[in-house]
A protein has these predicted regions:
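Active-site anion-handling motifs in enzyme catalytic cores
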Residues: 1-368
Length: 368
C-alpha cells in the first residue's frame, strides 16, 4: 500500500527529525511503501538566513544595514557549520522523501503525491501559535477524493486553541477520516469542537523499540559517566540542580545546548548524537518532550522541569499518563524519586499497543 506522511520534518530540531523518521520507518516495517512528503513552505524554509532582523528595534534606515553586516559573519559560520550539516545528513540518509518538493498547499492540490493513505503528524503540526497550525496542508486538505485521510499523534501543544481559530480548525478536522492526537488535552479540544472519535496515541518515537534506536545512534568518543542536561529555557535552577547532582555523584555534566556550567557541550551535533547521549547518560535533566520520551525508551532515570508556557502540556500529559507525576519538577528543591520501570513499562506497552492498533485500523480502510 502506498502511504504518504506530512509533518515538519526538516526544521533543525531533534524531536521533529526523529518523530518523522519513526512514523515512516514503522510503516515501512509493516511492509508498506511509505514516504514523507517533502513539504517546505516559506515559513519552514528559512532557518539559517544570511539577512534579516532578529530585533525590530533595529528596523531603521542605515541601522538595519549595519545590523545585518555585523551579524553576517556569524550567520555564514552557522550556515556552513557542523550542526546544520549533521541535520542535513540525517535528512538525506534517514528520511525517505518524495522526489518532488512542495512549497504550498496549492502546490500539493495541483499535483498531489500519490497514496492510498495519508497521515498528518506527528508533533506540533496543529499548534495555532505557529504558521503550520493554520496551514490547510497539515489537515490533509490536498488529499484526493477516495483516499484515506488520518492524523497520527498530532499535537495542539496547548490546553485549548484561540477562539478565533476554532471555526477553521473544526472545518479542517471534519475533513479527516480518522483523528488521533498525542495528548488528552488534544482529544478534549477535538471533542469540544463537536467532532467525535478522536483517539489518543503515543508519539511515533515509541513505535520503535530501544534496539532500533540504538542501531542508528552515533557514538560519542571519550565519554566519562555523566548527567545529561537539555534546557530550552536557560533556566538557572535547572543548571544548579544538574551541577549539584553531577558533583554529588562524581559525574560530568554534559549539555545538549550551550551552557557555561557544562563539562562538554553538544550544541553543534545532530539527532544521532542526541540518541547516544540519552542512551548512555547516568541521569537526564530536561524540559524537552523528546528528551523525556527517549529517557523512557532507554529506561533512564530522569526529571523534567516545568516550563511556564502553553507548550508544557506535552510533558505533563505524557508523565501523568504513565503515573510519573513526581518526575515533573517545579523547582530545584523538589524531591527526585527513583523510577520503578517494571510498573511503568506495563502502562507504556498498553499505550503503544493502542497506538499500533489505531494505525492498523486506518490501514485496513485503505485496503478496501
Amino acid at each position: 500500500m502506498k502511504i504518504k506522511t506530512i509533518t515538519c520534518h526538516d526544521v533543525y530540531n531533534v524531536g521533529a527529525s526523529l518523530q518523522a523518521y519513526a512514523l515512516v520507518t514503522y510503516l515501512r516495517k509493516l511492509g508498506h511503501d511509505a514516504q514523507i512528503i517533502d513539504y517546505k513552505p516559506d515559513y519552514l524554509s528559512n532557518h539559517y538566513p544570511l539577512w534579516g532582523l532578529g530585533n525590530p528595534a533595529y528596523d531603521k534606515p542605515v541601522i538595519r544595514e549595519l545590523y545585518n553586516l555585523a551579524k553576517l559573519p556569524g550567520r555564514l559560520k552557522a550556515r556552513n557549520g557542523k550542526r546544520k550539516a549533521e541535520y542535513d545528513r540525517f535528512t538525506a540518509e534517514f528520511l525517505p522523501l518524495t522526489p518532488r518538493r512542495y512549497t504550498s498547499n496549492d502546490d500539493l492540490k495541483q499535483n498531489p503525491p500519490e497514496a492510498d493513505v495519508y497521515f498528518a503528524g506527528s508533533d506540533q503540526i496543529w499548534n495555532c501559535f505557529f504558521p503550520n497550525g493554520k496551514d490547510p496542508a497539515f489537515y490533509l486538505d490536498f488529499a484526493p477524493a477516495g483516499s484515506v485521510r488520518a492524523s497520527y499523534a498530532a499535537s495542539f501543544a496547548m490546553d485549548d486553541i484561540p477562539e478565533e481559530w476554532k471555526p477553521d480548525v473544526k472545518r479542517r478536522l471534519s475533513g479527516l477520516d480518522h483523528i488521533s492526537v498525542r495528548e488528552s488535552s488534544g482529544a478534549a479540544i477535538v471533542e469540544r469542537l463537536g467532532i467525535p472519535g478522536a483517539v489518543q496515541v503515543m508519539d511515533p518515537v515509541f513505535l520503535l523499540d530501544s534496539e532500533a534506536w540504538a542501531s542508528i545512534e552515533k557514538p560519542v568518543p571519550n565519554t566519562e559517566p555523566y548527567v545529561l542536561l537539555y534546557d530550552f529555557d536557560r533556566n538557572p535552577e535547572m543548571v544548579r540542580f544538574t551541577r549539584r547532582m553531577a558533583e554529588e555523584n562524581g559525574w560530568k555534566l554534559y549539555s545538549v545546548l550551550s551552557c557555561g556550567e557544562c563539562d562538554r557541550c553538544f550544541e553543534q551535533d545532530g539527532p544521532l548524537t542526541f540518541l547516544n547521549l540519552v542512551h548512555h547518560a547516568q541521569f537526564v535533566v530536561s524540559n524537552s518532550f523528546h528528551a523525556t520520551a527517549f529517557s523512557l525508551i532507554f529506561r533512564k532515570q530522569f526529571v523534567v522541569f516545568n516550563r511556564q508556557e502553553h507548550i508544557n502540556t506535552r510533558m505533563r500529559d505524557l508523565l501523568y499518563g504513565l503515573g510519573l507525576r513526581d518526575c515533573l519538577m517545579d523547582s530545584a528543591g523538589s524531591d527526585c524519586l527513583r523510577i520503578d520501570y517494571p510498573q511503568i513499562l506495563e502502562r507504556l506497552d498498553e499505550k503503544v499497543s493502542v497506538s499500533k492498533a489505531y494505525i492498523e485500523n486506518v490501514l485496513s480502510e485503505g485496503k478496501r
